[in-house]
């Protein structure tokens, strides 16, 4: 193994000089002697000097320290040994529970499966969240993005999806915490532990306080672990169905921006790295389903300043099958989950995939909400009395639909004090169809707020009338 010496340190960027005939390849991992720091080669500058990004704090590094080339990319433990463990970007355990007992190590830089190996499916994944199941259904083996600005509930929605899908899902899950709050990572660990599904989850964290190199690569570490479960065939010759949760994809882009600036690249639009589309593509193209197994990924995407046209969320949109857009306006009405049903989309929204009843109900709900949106200006200026009877009826139903989209979450029980509700797809379609048909025109709209199925809304209305 060739050895070089550190010649320059500028923040997270470290230059290392090697013999001219022993220059490491781009993405090779270098180990710095006497420290736990790993460097990843990013550029070859010529004259035997390579520019690297440090995966870890460079505090205490000094010039002339020896760096050894491992002659391979960063490799992380994969397989059953990773389940129930919390690891960092290099696959080192950070849960103080001993070493990770892994039979194999895989490099984090891998190519996406070839076209012939890929497989698509139209099987639906029920989430138990009414607004998602009705308006933007998820596909098994699909890619889902939760878009939202600061504080509208991306992480809470993701936790509820983990709660509803991962616990009911017999397969394995991988959670990659990319540049998010350490507290949320801690909450997630305890949530999994308390519900006895920890032995089916591998957790990889690169949190907000870590250097940009860690935050940039931690998504690839988590993805590599998920790929192993998908590709490793069991006795029947099949891989596994894996759930991959990434919170937050925007922080991955942001870390790429920091690294790009540190490496001296010219920034592009809004200061992002010039390689934004390529970096996103490299990650997203690997998150796919093959003939042996599937990866269903749910990714939270922070939207800077609530601007969906920002280059980072706009680049992410192109890769997803379903987009769930969280709206600050809906959150301000106290309707949670604050999903905007008119702005959320799904490729599964096709009568041949989801069935005619589901499709027709979703379309009617959308039309009713759209009509209400158009009438809001008239209502604000002239009031409800100036509307025709038909329009009044549409507005009344739309307001009931809006409130019926709200739902108490299991993961928010400690804050709301009301028990979480899981609503099956069949009950969801039945409830919204009945509201559109006018079967519940006689009930007050408040009865539809924060309930599960339509029967609960009727029960709540009866209680309200009894109190009155």
From Swiss-Prot:
Reaction it catalyzes: ATP + H2O + 4 H(+)(in) = ADP + phosphate + 5 H(+)(out)
Gene it is expressed from: atpD
Mode of membrane association: Peripheral membrane protein
One MF annotation (Gene Ontology) recorded for this entry: proton-transporting ATP synthase activity, rotational mechanism
Statement: the UniProt record of this protein carries the keyword NAD: no
A Pfam family of this chain: ATP-synt_ab
Family of this protein: Belongs to the ATPase alpha/beta chains family.
Listed EC numbers: 7.1.2.2
SMART domains: AAA (SM00382)
Coiled-coil intervals: none
Role this protein plays: Produces ATP from ADP in the presence of a proton gradient across the membrane. The catalytic sites are hosted primarily by the beta subunits.
Record: residues binding ATP: 148-155
Protein name: ATP synthase subunit beta
Subcellular location: Cell inner membrane
Principal cellular location given in the protein's record: membrane
Record keywords: ATP synthesis, ATP-binding, Cell inner membrane, Cell membrane, CF(1), Hydrogen ion transport, Ion transport, Membrane, Nucleotide-binding, Translocase, Transport
Taxonomic superkingdom: Bacteria
GO CC annotation, single: proton-transporting ATP synthase complex
Subunit details: F-type ATPases have 2 components, CF(1) - the catalytic core - and CF(0) - the membrane proton channel. CF(1) has five subunits: alpha(3), beta(3), gamma(1), delta(1), epsilon(1). CF(0) has three main subunits: a(1), b(2) and c(9-12). The alpha and beta chains form an alternating ring which encloses part of the gamma chain. CF(1) is attached to CF(0) by a central stalk formed by the gamma and epsilon chains, while a peripheral stalk is formed by the delta and b chains.
Record has Chloroplast as a keyword: no
UniProt-listed PROSITE patterns: ATPASE_ALPHA_BETA
């Amino acid at each position: 193994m060739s050895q070089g010496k550190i010649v320059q340190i500028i923040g997270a960027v470290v230059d290392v000089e090697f013999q001219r005939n022993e220059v490491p390849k781009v993405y090779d991992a270098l180990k710095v002697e006497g420290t736990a720091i790993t460097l990843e080669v990013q550029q070859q500058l010529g004259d035997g000097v390579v520019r690297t990004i440090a995966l870890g704090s460079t505090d205490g590094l000094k010039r002339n320290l020896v760096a050894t080339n491992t002659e391979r990319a960063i490799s992380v433990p994969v397989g059953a040994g990773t389940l129930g463990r919390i690891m960092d970007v290099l696959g080192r355990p950070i849960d103080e529970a001993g070493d990770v007992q892994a039979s194999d190590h895989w490099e984090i830089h891998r190519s996406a499966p070839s076209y012939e190996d890929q497989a698509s499916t139209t099987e639906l994944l029920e989430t138990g969240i009414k607004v998602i199941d009705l308006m933007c259904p998820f596909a098994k083996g699909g890619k889902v993005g939760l878009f939202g600005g600061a504080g509208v509930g991306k992480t809470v929605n993701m936790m509820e999806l983990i709660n509803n899908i991962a616990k009911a899902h017999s397969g394995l899950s991988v959670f990659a915490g990319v540049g998010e709050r350490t507290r949320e990572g801690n909450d997630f660990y305890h949530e999994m532990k308390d519900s006895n599904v920890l032995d089916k989850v591998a957790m990889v964290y690169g949190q907000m306080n870590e250097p940009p190199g860690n935050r940039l690569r931690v998504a690839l570490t988590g993805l590599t672990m998920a790929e192993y479960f998908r590709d490793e065939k069991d006795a029947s010759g099949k891989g596994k169905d894996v759930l991959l949760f990434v919170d937050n994809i925007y922080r991955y882009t942001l870390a790429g921006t920091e690294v790009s600036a540190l490496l001296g690249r010219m920034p592009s639009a809004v200061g992002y790295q010039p390689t934004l589309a390529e970096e996103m593509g490299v990650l997203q193209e690997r998150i796919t389903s093959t003939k042996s197994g599937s990866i269903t990924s749910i990714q939270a995407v922070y939207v800077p300043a609530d601007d969906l046209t920002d280059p980072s969320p706009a680049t992410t949109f192109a890769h997803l099958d379903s987009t769930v857009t969280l709206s600050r306006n809906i959150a301000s009405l106290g309707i949670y989950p604050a999903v905007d049903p008119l702005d959320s989309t799904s490729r599964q929204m096709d009568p041949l995939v989801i069935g005619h009843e589901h499709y027709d109900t979703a379309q009617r709900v959308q039309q009713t909400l759209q009509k209400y949106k158009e009438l809001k200006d008239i209502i604000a200026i002239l009031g409800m009395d100036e509307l025709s009877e038909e329009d009044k009826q549409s507005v009344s139903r739309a307001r009931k639909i809006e409130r019926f989209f709200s739902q108490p979450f299991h993961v928010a029980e400690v804050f709301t004090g009301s028990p979480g509700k899981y609503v099956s797809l069949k009950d969801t379609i039945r409830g919204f169809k009945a509201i559109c048909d006018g079967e519940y025109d006689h009930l007050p709209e408040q009865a539809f707020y924060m309930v599960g199925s339509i029967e609960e809304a009727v029960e709540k209305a009866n209680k309200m009338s009894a109190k009155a």
